[in-house]
Amino acid sequence: LDPSHLIWQGMDPIQVIRALGGDAIFHVHAKDTKIDPINAPIDGTLDYRPYGDEIHRSWIFRSIGYGHDELFWKDFVSQLRLVGYDYVLSIEHEDSLMSKNEGLVKACDVLKRAITFEDKMTKARWM
């Protein structure tokens, strides 16, 4: 599951996770996409421009937190856990606006706050 591709296609990764369910998700990429608010409404998101022409593209891949905010990523990992996926998130860096090292550090910063690391509570105390 790669949310960055779902985003540029106009899909909602949170809803896709719920629709697929945990049985259909075997690996998850942690990569973001920023839809350009000036170019996308004019050109759509099926962009034909070279990836290096960022200023004219309708979207570009971004590091985690630079296309969508931290709340989105908290919702993303929570939905994965809700459907039963509790495994690897592979950070994939294709952000042309920052170095690989900086992109990795910034992605890790956001994901550390978004991911829950302890076992989930399986039964509510009132049940």
Region locations from a protein language model:
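Acidic/histidine-rich catalytic cores of soluble enzymes
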Residues: 1-66, 122-126
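A general structural motif
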Residues: 22-25, 82-88
